[in-house]
Amino acid sequence: MATEGDKLLGGRFVGSVDPIMEILSSSISTEQRLTEVDIQASMAYAKALEKASILTKTELEKILSGLEKISEESSKGVLVMTQSDEDIQTAIERRLKELIGDIAGKLQTGRSRNEQVVTDLKLLLKSSISVISTHLLQLIKTLVERAAIEIDIIMPGYTHLQKALPIRWSQFLLSHAVALTRDSERLGEVKKRITVLPLGSGVLAGNPLEIDRELLRSELDMTSITLNSIDAISERDFVVELISVATLLMIHLSKLAEDLIIFSTTEFGFVTLSDAYSTGSSLLPQKKNPDSLELIRSKAGRVFGRLAAILMVLKGIPSTFSKDLQEDKEAVLDVVDTLTAVLQVATGVISTLQINKENMEKALTPELLSTDLALYLVRKGMPIRQAQTASGKAVHLAETKGITINNLTLEDLKSISPLFASDVSQVFSVVNSVEQYTAVGGTAKSSVTAQIEQLRELLKKQKEQA
């Protein structure tokens, strides 16, 4: 373990820290991913120190050169961590001193690890959100373009997992695409707050050296700077927001996964997953398990747990910095990794999914058109409640006769209502059924086509903002 002389804060204390305490305190394994962004922030801060006359130009050049060397070592995987490195910030500081000597100590002038940690995390999440957004938009695009290609496929729509009305397969796909566009918008909103720069806030009271925070903002390509130093070092709203957005996104992906799991069962047989996203059974050779979709569904629970955990961490801490905040990185970075993987798998599943059109058509049984029978009577002038009752009587009559509703004779229907005429035969067509829903957002072909065009335009805008 590290000696007292090695410790960053060792001058205040006598004796050594319990080794178990050092293990509990260390976050180096999680924080190694912050290496590059910490180097970027350190380079920017060094330039600000030079502008404030704390560093000479020669010292600045040495520090920048040393940081570039560390960046190179990190990218090659040869940056060595030692037992004295409590976190990535101390590891970089230690390595910089090894490379350029005591001048390295000047880099921390006026800068605390409190602001370093939150700055590094914001910089990493800024780029992470861009990656997640790219994958999310690709998934939405895959859903939309598949909907455009398969617009003529009609299937049963369900409520309570019971057959309800005929809909277009494309209407189903677009329902998920639309939900995901809201997630994309929310990611953009979170990014606005992540790109507010806390660097220059010091340990809690601000920076005493007239550091140019606008220079820091410009160097790090952030949108604005934090307003209050105490709030800047302690706020983790952006972590909660990102995980909250991820939670909603995972709810939507879990719903998509569950729908497709159901549709892929032999009882439904509407879709077949690609072998690339399925597994077999060690004992049951006939089975094709939708593991990819089941994992997407289960990963939602993992993300929900991370949200609950970070909320519990934050709810009891006082203002400024507490060691509790060390838990933020593991939580949010795990969520980032989960989303990145899940979105790519979901896109792969959708892009390779086989549609079993014949099975969908077989499932379009005549009782699905019972509502259309009621609408027929409404168009003849009957109030909707009476029309629904009449339709229900027709269903009951068909059941009594042991036939399907479309096999009732005109005389049978007239016994229920004199408004039924020979044109009632047009009701018993699934194409006619879906085509009556022409209002915006409906399942008629014209409406679905309009949805596709609107989503394509929305994707263009969101891609520009990602």
UniProtKB/Swiss-Prot annotation:
Highest taxon, organism lineage: Eukaryota
Tissues expressed in: Eye lens.
Annotated InterPro entries: Arg_succ_lyase_C, Argininosuccinate_lyase, Fumarase/histidase_N, Fumarate_lyase_fam, Fumarate_lyase_N, L-Aspartase-like
GO molecular function list: structural constituent of eye lens
CDD domains per record: Argininosuccinate_lyase (cd01359)
Subunit structure: Homotetramer.
Protein name (database record): Delta-1 crystallin
